[in-house]
Amino acid sequence: MRSNIKSMLICFFDQKGIVHREFVLPGHTVNAAFYVEVLAHLRENMRRKRPDQWRNNTWLLHHDNAPAHAALLTRWFLTDNNMTLVPHPPYSPDLAACNFFLFPKLKMRLKGRRFQTEEIPAELQAVLNTLRENDFQECFKNWQRRWDHCQASEGDYSEGDAGH
């Protein structure tokens, strides 16, 4: 019998690698209050892991338009903490780096294997640990191509387009 236990990973990364990641416990919902806590942890990790970007406030945040991301509480937190947000066009899952880069890599490495729920975070972390700086650099080159394509097509969504 196939199990459809879902494990949620929230992950923030830049061209150098993963800055912050959190696993959401099964049964928990990512609402605005939870997401603001995650963003507070992200800020702390940015301060620790990318001190120059933190000091100069040269880092940007990109996330999709999920309800927790677009909520008023989240927007207040971003404003109050002077966090610069890269806007995400609506209905553009192909522009979310986690969707086209990170999650496919995780799925590819874990596909066909079975885990106990409590094993999932360690297994995901093991896959994350295999990613190298050049993987993240390629991701952002791909992201730029996708943004260029989106802009050239005036935002028309074209799933599976060769430009991706």
Language-model segment annotations:
Residues 1-164:
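Surface/interface recognition patches
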